Design a protein with these regions (language model features):
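Non-catalytic surface loops within mature trypsin-like serine protease
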Residues: 97-99, 148-150, 161-163, 188
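A structural signal for short, well-ordered beta-strand segments
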Residues: 91-93, 132, 144-146, 157-161, ...
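N-terminal lobe of the biotin/lipoate ligase/transferase fold
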Residues: 1-135, 140-141, 166, 191-192, ...
Length: 230
């Protein structure tokens, strides 16, 4: 438990700004800044995002989704299309895997284990499938799509807490036919907000990844966000 990860709880942030923030934090790693391992925890306004395989999402598809009141972004993460929005805990781990284990497969597996442990803490039986992510039976509760650059990770996971699941009706989530989506609130039949889930996620991440965490220094947070807003 000697590895240290800084936790940055932002609240609501646009997807565009989150991309800029991730690039900044990745750059800190590549500049060999100390103590750069960071978990960014936030929620997004409604947005559909695709991964590196974007051929099946022509511009008309993007326009149709935007007409629903959501943004649309193409990204360099793995995976196909998914939705982010209010009531969903999005976590972007910006980690140097050389501080853990330099393997993207190991990393994705441990992200899945983290979310499964979180679900277990709430009394939900969750697991994996041949498809990436965390599932409750045939319904995906957490999407995972990551990117690695010289073993520095970006993008991450999206866990449905109290998400409006009707947003997913307009897409084939993660490109997987015949499967559904669910949320912590739906499975527990009560409202489960992001604020309740964050501490459970952090504890589960600490246990699975063998690290401990501290809050990201507020002054450093303010300085970075000020640069992004300009």
């Amino acid at each position: 438990m000697n590895k240290l990860v800084k936790v940055w709880q932002i609240g609501r942030l646009s997807y565009r700004k989150s991309l800029e923030l991730q690039k900044h934090l990745v750059r800190l790693h590549h500049e060999n800044k100390e103590l750069s391992n960071t978990l960014v925890c936030l929620e997004h306004p409604p947005v559909y995002t695709t991964g590196i395989r974007t051929g099946q999402y022509p511009e008309q598809v993007a326009k149709n989704l935007e007409q629903l009141g959501a943004e649309f972004y193409r990204t360099n993460r793995g995976g196909l299309i998914t939705f982010h929005g209010p009531g969903q805990l999005v976590v972007y781990p910006i980690l140097n895997l050389k501080d853990f284990k330099p393997s993207m497969r190991w990393y994705v597996c441990h992200i899945e284990k983290t979310v499964i442990r979180l679900c277990n803490k709430l009394g939900i039986e969750a697991g994996t499938s041949p498809n990436t992510g965390v599932w409750v039976k045939d319904n995906k509760i957490c999407a995972i799509g990551v990117h690695g650059s010289r073993f520095v990770t970006s993008h991450g996971l999206a866990l449905n807490c109290s998400t409006d699941l009707t947003w997913f009706e307009h897409i084939v989530p993660c490109g997987i036919e015949g499967k559904g989506v669910t949320s912590l609130s739906k499975e527990l039949n009560r409202h489960v907000d992001v604020e309740e889930v964050v501490p459970l996620f952090l504890d589960s991440f600490s246990e699975i990844f063998g690290c401990h965490y501290v809050d990201f220094p507020k002054k450093e947070c303010d300085n970075i966000l000020a640069d992004l807003i300009q």
